[in-house]
Curated annotation (Swiss-Prot):
Coiled-coil ranges (or none): none
Gene3D superfamilies: Helical scaffold and wing domains of SecA (1.10.3060.10), P-loop containing nucleotide triphosphate hydrolases (3.40.50.300), SecA, preprotein cross-linking domain (3.90.1440.10)
Subunit structure: Monomer and homodimer. Part of the essential Sec protein translocation apparatus which comprises SecA, SecYEG and auxiliary proteins SecDF. Other proteins may also be involved.
Cofactor note: May bind 1 zinc ion per subunit.
PROSITE patterns xref list: SECA, SECA_MOTOR_DEAD
Encoding gene, per UniProt annotation: secA1
Name under which the protein is recorded: Protein translocase subunit SecA 1
NCBIfam families membership: PRK09200.1, secA
Protein residues bound to ATP: Q91, G109, E110, G111, K112, T113, D498
Subcellular location: Cell membrane; Cytoplasm
């Protein structure tokens, strides 16, 4: 209780502080009102000039804090002249919280878009770029078009970044003072910028300040979804088909156990025996059968934990994911780790090839790279701990401009879903008769269609808004507040929509919101309630629940069931009890806690790859930006030679065999016969290094002479190709390691620590392989340059999607044609060890 009161007190103190600063802004209203349009723009130029002379980011921020009242007053005056609207004091307070790098929680209809204009203008003055981020391209386009009028009036430029834009158009959009974009497109542009071969192909500037609209949706709900650019992997789909047939044969409890609370499913001993017989293996859990067990587990997840028309839909022979937080389908996105293919096998549609990850990043790690991050939403307080721990952001609840008049009624709980839905329909019919508009919220497509059929039977005209007819969303939502309107919507109605009341509706009680089930997240329930009672309008809300709802089943409705039976309650009699509502909220908190733990765990694992990604991208960028790559190559040649000497030469051996070392040197650095054992026999390691190094220098000089002024371009191309090839393989290897690492806990090992240690070892091996490949190709390649080749710029950046098979196939840049010796993975290792290449120096 003490912790909660501290949060409440903290919010009160912060509101008081914001209020005082907002008063300073409002006090300048008369002074700014007398300025001419040109004088306002001159103020902008003056601020920009002052900031341009300050190089240090911290000192720039101090200056922005100093000019905040004057800058915000200018935006208020500009808004008054351009839109005939002036931000209220509470909006100014929200704008100050955003400038601080925090989250402004503002209720629906309180004008978040106008609130964001003040911190956007202020921070754009620094000239480092401000990204205003929305959840979809429709909102980015409409907001940038509308707000550009204000920013242009104030003397700032605005860019719009869309998936369909070309490289040039994207670069231009990012070069503006303010750039509107979706979170997806920003993440993909970052990844693509780190896959280019030439500096001029990059589109982004360094990440400075981002303001995220619907911040909880992007940083919490989508935190576990990685952005992935991938290419097609050559893998057979037959195992998916076999695993699907096997999963269909299994019986619950006998062959597998399913935990409804955690949604975990795994084979029993009997199920494992069946699998061994079906797949003809001796020990299912043997390391060599990891692919089989992986496919079986994935097929089980597809059959047991995922439901059609709830978690995904099948449209025109294609499996589309349904976003659990918006109810929308997500074309282009695919479940990763083979789950999408398992669902395709389950549904009998064409199984698409798996994809190989070429680059990936989670939103958690992408957004933490900004110098300053802020956001706004109607619902964030319930997740404040996560925002504080992971993003170092505080949630400030901004007061409403007018008091909230919506009445939130307590939940009604029924024994069965049939009893619940019958009661819902009766409530809708009654409200519809008097003309009160009703918004019915459901958690799944199938529920919305079921209620729709019940209402049709009662002759109630209504609209249905779900993933199957989302194209009419704007039209349906615009009519939802009209007299007599009945709208059934999945969670998708909760985002980016503002339902305005029609004539005479206020007198009828405003918009009535009816929830047909509690979502596992309290925020989603709050969003549904928030559709009603905007800007001081009247309204009411109520949730109808049943003991058969998923949340109730997962978190123990047995006690309630027994109590209702003991009281002799039938299906038509509900319980209306604060105790029950508290129990539901407690269940939601547990789910939220589980989800937070899962996101935290993902971040801990992803931190390993984040550090490695940073090293690789920094190295790539240094190579691209460097005029001279010979120093990098020289360092690689020296370290590779030194490693070989450390590995092959044992000075304590009285009768050493130099053959493996000579074979390795001739294979990686020199031509056959260039190094003889007589030259190094009896020499110590330092002498051997100098002897071989002089030969390497000679070989390098010959290559330089052959290539002339093309040498630097050739080296750069080889370096980038080596890095990209091995980095892509490394991501794949790390992904495989991560998929099976949790099994280590059964052996009393710490999976995270093992992942960190083994990931570090794999990274070291990859770096060595990059160096070795670079040495070999630079010294031993026969090079021919194509005549009159112009650099071909990528025409569009619109190919990357979430985990799709076509991603990452960017047009190749003109590069030297390399004719080098290739060693097959199963060939004998050239070092002479007698091992296969993949188990020796080809190890990745």
């Amino acid at each position: 209780m003490g912790f909660l009161s501290k949060i409440v007190d903290g919010n009160k103190k912060e509101i008081k502080r914001l209020g005082k600063l907002a008063d300073k802004v409002l006090a300048l209203e008369e002074d700014t009102a007398i300025l001419t349009d040109e004088e306002i723009r001159e103020k902008t130029k003056s601020f920009q000039k002052e900031l341009a002379e300050i190089e240090d980011v911290k000192k720039q921020n101090d200056y922005l804090d100093k000019i905040l009242p004057e800058a915000y007053a200018l935006v208020r005056e500009g808004s008054k002249r351009v839109f005939n609207m002036i931000p209220y004091k509470v909006q100014v307070m929200g704008g100050i919280a955003i400038h601080k790098g925090d989250i402004a929680e503002m209720r629906t209809g309180e004008g978040k878009t106008l609130t964001a204009t003040m911190p956007t203008y202020l921070n754009a003055l620094a000239g480092r770029g401000v990204h205003v981020i929305t959840v979809n391209e429709y909102l980015s386009s409409s907001q940038s078009e509308e707000m550009a009028e204000l920013y242009n009036y104030l003397g700032l430029t605005v860019g719009l970044n869309l998936n369909s834009k070309s490289t040039e158009e994207k670069r231009e959009a990012y070069a503006q003072d303010i750039t509107y974009s979706t979170n997806n497109e920003l993440g993909f542009d970052y990844l693509r910028d780190n896959m280019v071969n030439y500096a001029e192909e990059r589109v982004m500037r360094p990440l400075h300040f981002a303001i995220i609209d619907e911040v909880d949706s992007i940083l919490i709900d989508e935190a576990r979804t990685p952005l992935i650019i991938s290419g097609e992997a050559e893998k057979s789909t037959s195992l998916y088909t076999q695993a699907n047939v096997f999963a269909k044969m299994l019986k619950a409890e006998d062959d597998y156990n399913y935990d409804e609370k955690t949604k975990a499913v795994h084979l029993t001993e009997q199920g494992a025996d069946k699998a061994e017989r079906m797949f003809k293996v001796d020990n299912l859990y043997d390391v060599q059968n990891v692919e089989v067990i992986s496919h079986i587990n994935t097929a089980l997840r597809a059959h047991v934990t995922l439901q059609r028309d709830v978690d995904y839909m099948v449209v025109d022979g294609e499996v589309l994911i349904v976003d659990q937080f918006t109810g929308r389908t997500m074309p282009g996105r695919r479940f990763s780790e083979g789950l999408h293919q398992a669902i395709e096998a389950k549904e009998g549609v064409a199984i698409q090839n798996e994809s190989k990850t070429m680059a990936s990043i989670t939103f958690q790690n992408y957004f933490r790279m900004y110098n300053k991050l802020a956001g706004m939403t109607g619902t964030a307080k319930t997740e404040e701990e996560e925002f504080r721990n992971i993003y170092n952001m505080t949630v400030t609840q901004i007061p409403t401009n007018k008091p909230v008049q919506r009445k939130d009624n307590s939940d009604l709980i029924y024994i069965s879903q049939k009893g619940k839905f019958d009661a819902v329909v009766e409530d809708v019919v009654e409200k519809h008769k008097k003309g009160q508009p009703v918004l019915l919220g459901t958690v799944a497509v199938e529920t919305s269609e079921y209620i729709s059929n019940l209402l049709k039977k009662r002759g109630v005209r209504h609209d249905v808004l779900n993933a199957k007819n989302h194209e009419r969303e704007a039209e349906i939502v615009s009519n939802a507040g009209q007299k007599g309107a009945v709208t059934i919507a999945t969670n998708m109605a909760g985002r980016g929509t503002d339902i305005k009341l029609g004539d005479g509706v206020e007198e009828l009680g405003g918009l009535a919101v009816i929830g047909t089930e509690r979502h596992e997240s309290r925020r989603i329930d709050d969003q549904l309630r928030g559709r009603s009672g905007r800007q001081g309008d009247r309204g009411d809300s109520r949730f109808y629940l049943s003991l058969q709802d998923e949340l109730m089943v997962r978190f123990g409705s047995e006690r309630l069931q027994k109590m209702m039976n003991r009281l002799g309650m039938d299906d038509s009699t509900p319980i209306e009890s604060k105790m029950v509502s508290r129990a539901v909220e407690s269940a939601q908190k547990r789910v939220e806690g589980n989800n937070f733990d899962a996101r935290k765990r993902i971040l801990e694992y992803d931190e390993v790859l984040r550090k490695q990604r940073e090293i690789i991208y920094n190295e790539r960028n240094e190579i691209i930006d460097s005029e001279e790559s010979s120093q990098v190559v020289n360092a690689m040649l020296r370290s590779t030679l030194q490693r070989a000497i450390n590995h092959f030469i044992n000075e304590e051996d009285d009768n050493p065999d130099y053959t493996p070392f000579i074979n390795y040197v001739n294979d990686v650095f020199l031509q056959e016969g260039d190094l003889q054992d007589t030259e190094i026999k009896g020499k110590d390691s330092e002498d051997i290094f100098e002897i071989v190094w002089s030969k390497i220098e000679k070989a390098y000089a010959q290559q330089q002479e052959t290539l002339g002024d093309q040498m630097s371009e050739f080296e750069r191309m080889i370096l980038l190709r080596s890095i990209d090839t091995h980095w892509t393989d490394h991501i794949d290897t790390m992904d495989q390691l991560r998929q099976g690492i949790h099994l280590r806990s059964y052996a009393q090992q710490n999976p995270l620590r093992d992942y960190q240690n083994e990931g570090h070892e794999l990274f070291d091996i990859m770096m060595q392989n990059i160096e070795e490949d670079t040495c070999k190709y630079i010294l031993k390649s026969v090079v021919q340059f194509e005549d009159d080749v112009e650099r071909e710029k990528s025409k569009s950046f619109g190919e990357a999607k979430h985990v799709t098979a076509e991603d990452g196939k960017e047009k190749a840049k003109p590069q030297p044609i390399v004719k080098g010796d290739q060693v097959g993975r199963n060939d004998p290792c050239p070092c002479g060890s007698g091992k296969k290449y993949k188990n020796c120096h080809g190890k990745a």
